[in-house]
C-alpha cells in the first residue's frame, strides 16, 4: 500500500526559501506571482493488507520523524 505524505510549513510562519524564490521570480519578470511556499512530498510503501493500521503507522512516522509538528502540517493520502 502506497501513501503520499505532503508536508507544508504552517500558515503564518516565515518561509525564507519561498520569499527568496518570489524575489527571484519577480526579477525574472514574473511580476504576477504573489506567493511561493516550499514543502515536501514523501511516498511510503507499506507491506500491509490493513489500510487503517498502515495509515496509523504512516501517521506515527510523521509525528516521530518526517514532520516537525511545531512548524509543519502534513496530510496523508493513499495512492496505491
Describe the role of every protein-language-model region.
Residues 8, 28-31, 61, 66:
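Residue-level signal for pocket-adjacent positions within structured domains
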Residues 12-28:
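Short amphipathic alpha-helix segments
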Residues 13-16, 50-56:
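Short, conserved charged micro-motifs
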Residues 31-40:
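Amphipathic, hydrophobic secondary-structure cores in small proteins
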Residues 52-80:
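C-terminal structural segments of small proteins and small subunits
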